[in-house]
Design a protein with these regions (language model features):
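Short, electropositive alpha-helical surface patch
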Residues: 109-122
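Glycine/small-residue-rich phosphate/adenosyl-binding loop
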Residues: 6, 11-12, 16-83
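A short beta-loop-alpha structural element at the N-terminal edge
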Residues: 1-5
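Structural motif
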Residues: 53-55, 98, 120-122
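C-terminal helix-cap and adjacent tail motif
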Residues: 124-150
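Residue-level "edge-of-site" marker
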Residues: 27, 104-106, 123
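Short secondary-structure boundary segments
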Residues: 60, 103, 129
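Small-aliphatic-rich amphipathic alpha-helix that forms the alpha element of a beta-alpha
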Residues: 14-15, 56, 71-112
Length: 150
């Protein structure tokens, strides 16, 4: 993805995502350099993943996230997930494909990228142009399986 404006648009959409009490406990790492891509790929080394031209890593910071008083639930992960979905939706809107990845080694990531103890990676979103003939297709559950009207 050579068009920096597309990446800027995607990040702007993520930046504007809602968060609990508007605390915005996230940080976005846009990985474009070959050296940093290699560091990232050590954390999740799959053939399809290593071909992506750009990655956005969504990190959360529990120290600045809202915490629900009734049960001490920290909302950093939830807020980061909302921002991650904004990334995926923005990418689709401008004709890019994305894949939200959580099956990576977060400790190796923190070591490779020197994250502070409070900041941690929640998701890696690979971005690129969609193949004309995709390698695989996913199925979705029928609406009747997942929706209850009350």
């Amino acid at each position: 993805i050579r068009d920096r404006d597309k990446i800027d648009y995607i990040i702007e959409c993520a930046r504007l995502a809602p968060s609990a009490v508007n605390y915005q406990p996230w940080h976005f790492m846009v990985v474009v350099s070959e050296e940093q891509k290699q560091n990232l790929r050590q954390c999740y080394n799959r053939e399809w993943f290593v071909r992506a031209p750009v990655y956005i890593v969504v990190c959360a910071d529990k120290s600045i996230a809202w915490v629900r008083k009734s049960d001490n639930k920290n909302h950093a992960d939830i807020d980061a997930a909302i921002a991650t979905e904004h990334i995926c939706l923005a990418a689709a809107e401008i004709g890019l494909g994305s894949c939200w990845v959580c099956n990576f080694d977060p400790e190796l990531f923190k070591a490779n990228f020197g994250l502070s103890s409070e900041r941690y990676p929640v998701a890696i979103v690979s971005l690129g142009y969609i193949q004309e003939q995709p390698d695989h297709f996913t199925t979705r559950k029928d609406k009747d399986e997942i929706v209850t009207f009350l």
